[in-house]
Amino acid sequence: MTSVAAIPEYRTLTPDALDALERAVRERRRVALRRRGTEYVVVAERLETSGRDEVLAGRLPMTGEVLAFRLRDLETFAVLP
């Protein structure tokens, strides 16, 4: 029997959470995130600073549109395998 590791879901911006996002950007991984009750799955493009906010830019796989998500607005996120 094979055990499957759980995908870590982050609810706060801890150093581990930021490391996971940075790794997702480097590896162009998918990120499932929830903002204002809406769930998105995007391909991580870049992390940047906008004013006083850190922003994740993610591309929607179906349309190719790039959306910007302020990290402080995220309720949860998980980097998908």
Question: Model regions: which residues?
Answer:
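Short glycine- and basic-residue-enriched patches
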Residues: 1-81
